[in-house]
């Protein structure tokens, strides 16, 4: 389903390629691995901290998530399922898994710190929102993962679709991260 949505550009015939299906299978594996990582860290205490007071990586991922929600919502309203699925793919694979999870691993090693508690909250909050965002495209996988996580309600279907949250928007964190990426690029 996700593969078909990603390939469904208006006015274009879909040429189903086995390589594309394999690529999105790998994406599904990435989601499962992110869920396993989350489950390893959910047993610790979490802290309810306002988004503006969270760490740099936490503010950055929440800002990227709310921007992705805005993009996906806009693309779905225009029936651009290809662009909506691409935005979800880019966020989950490249921002959440490749960058955010790698940035927070050192923080999560000290389980008792206030920083770790806040980061666990952001990790869980972001993943839960990602599953609701992904659900129309991958309903079976998102539901299966949802059932393994602590949650309220019987099903992910009963949860509201994510909306843009102004309190998560942090242009400052995004600019800092862009600068960090530029510096990293210069060093390589």
Could you describe each region identified by the protein language model?
Residues 16-20, 87-88, 119, 147-148:
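Composition- and surface-driven signal marking solvent-exposed, interaction-prone regions
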Residues 44-73, 102-188:
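Acidic, turn-prone loop/beta-hairpin segments
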Residues 76-83:
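Short helix-adjacent coil turns
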Residues 5-6, 26-39, 56-68, 86-107, ...:
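Core structural elements
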Residues 1-54, 150-152:
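Catalytic adenosine-cofactor/nucleotide-binding cores of aminoacyl-tRNA synthetases and other
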């Amino acid at each position: 389903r996700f593969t078909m949505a990603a390939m469904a550009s208006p006015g274009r015939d879909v040429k189903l390629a086995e390589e594309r299906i394999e690529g999105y299978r790998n994406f599904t594996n990435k989601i499962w691995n992110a869920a396993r990582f989350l489950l390893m860290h959910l047993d610790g205490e979490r802290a309810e901290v306002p988004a503006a007071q969270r760490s740099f990586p936490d503010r950055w991922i929440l800002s990227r998530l709310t921007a992705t929600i805005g993009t996906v919502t806009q693309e779905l309203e225009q029936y651009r399922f290809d662009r909506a699925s691409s935005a979800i793919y880019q966020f989950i694979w490249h921002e959440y898994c490749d960058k955010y999870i790698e940035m927070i691993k050192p923080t999560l090693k000290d389980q008792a710190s206030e920083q770790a508690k806040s980061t666990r909250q952001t990790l869980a909050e972001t993943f839960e929102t990602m599953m609701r965002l992904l659900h129309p495209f991958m309903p079976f996988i998102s539901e299966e993962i949802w059932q393994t996580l602590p949650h309220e309600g019987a099903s992910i279907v009963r949860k509201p679709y994510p909306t843009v949250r102004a309190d998560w928007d942090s242009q400052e964190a995004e600019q800092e991260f862009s600068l960090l990426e530029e510096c990293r690029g210069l060093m390589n």
